[in-house]
């Protein structure tokens, strides 16, 4: 991909830097949860700098051309005060909101209580429109206690609350063995995880699709980063940056 470029001047030094129209903030860290103030300060300043922790090299990005931001977060509540700023600047956004229910499983100890996260989801949906807040139950984790049936119960509990506040549910199947640090943490915490196989993926997909229809949610269902083809269950492959959705959300701007 070739980025648009622009010049910025810092401490008397002028340099050519990328100036994309669309910003992804961010899959590397939860910017909305932990760095919302910093991000919007940099947006106002017009650029950000990132230093590679391994070689110390600095990379810059300009916000001169920014017209749309895709946010990723488990707690986007700190974005709420900044939504008027985005509107004032003519910058659109949508939010990939990871809203899981592992509260009683010691798998997400650093997140806010589920009830508070659900309320944040609803507030964002009311502010931005339900098409602009995507529900991610990500990843789906199997353990000796968490079965596919229990996962479906967890999804149903949340879906009952928020199906009127979103249009889409995205999910993935946890590949614990592919992530050494995650695997080590699970073992250290005494959590006996289980890996997904194709049969269990198909079982969950079929039942999730049925749940979506039976409950009248009518959500678009999609997987994230999964090679398995689940089209027969009306489940598509998600796009991280969805050009069609961005076009919908900016059609009136």
Regions found by a protein language model. Give the residues of each.
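Short catalytic/ligand-binding loop motif for oxyanion handling, primarily in non-cytosolic enzymes
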Residues: 33, 104-105, 141-145, 177-180, ...
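Conserved C-terminal portion of the radical SAM core fold
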Residues: 116-183, 206-216, 220-223
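Short, surface-exposed, charged loop/turn segments at secondary-structure junctions
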Residues: 182-191, 232-240
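Active-site beta-loop-alpha junctions enriched in small/polar residues
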Residues: 28-30, 74, 98-102, 138-140, ...
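Conserved Radical SAM active-site core
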Residues: 1-107, 114, 118-130
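Surface-exposed cleft-lining segments at the edges of enzyme active sites
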Residues: 103-111, 139-149, 187-196
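C-terminal accessory extensions appended to soluble enzyme cores
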Residues: 198-253
């Amino acid at each position: 991909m070739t980025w648009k470029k622009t010049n910025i001047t810092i401490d008397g030094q002028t340099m050519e830097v990328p100036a994309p129209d669309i910003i992804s903030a961010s899959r590397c860290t939860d910017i909305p949860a932990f760095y919302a103030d910093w991000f919007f300060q940099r947006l106002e300043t017009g650029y950000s700098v990132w230093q590679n922790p391994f070689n110390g090299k600095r990379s810059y990005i300009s916000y001169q051309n920014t017209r749309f931001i895709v946010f990723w977060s488990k707690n986007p509540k700190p974005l709420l005060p900044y939504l008027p700023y985005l509107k004032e600047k003519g910058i659109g956004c949508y939010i990939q909101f990871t809203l899981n229910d592992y509260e009683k499983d010691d798998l997400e100890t650093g997140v806010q209580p589920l009830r508070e996260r659900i309320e944040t989801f609803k507030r964002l949906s009311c502010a931005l429109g339900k098409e602009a807040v995507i529900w991610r139950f990500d990843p789906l984790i199997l353990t000796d206690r968490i079965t596919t049936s229990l996962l479906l119960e967890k999804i149903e509990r949340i879906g009952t609350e928020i199906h009127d506040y979103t249009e889409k549910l995205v999910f993935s199947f946890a590949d614990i063995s592919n992530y050494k640090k995650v695997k080590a943490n699970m073992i250290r915490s005494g959590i006996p995880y289980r890996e997904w196989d194709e049969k269990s993926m198909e079982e969950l997909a079929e039942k999730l699709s049925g749940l979506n229809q039976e409950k009248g949610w009518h959500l678009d269902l999609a997987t994230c980063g999964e090679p398995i083809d689940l089209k027969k269950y009306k489940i598509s492959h998600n796009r991280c940056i969805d050009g069609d959705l961005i076009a919908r959300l900016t059609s009136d701007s």
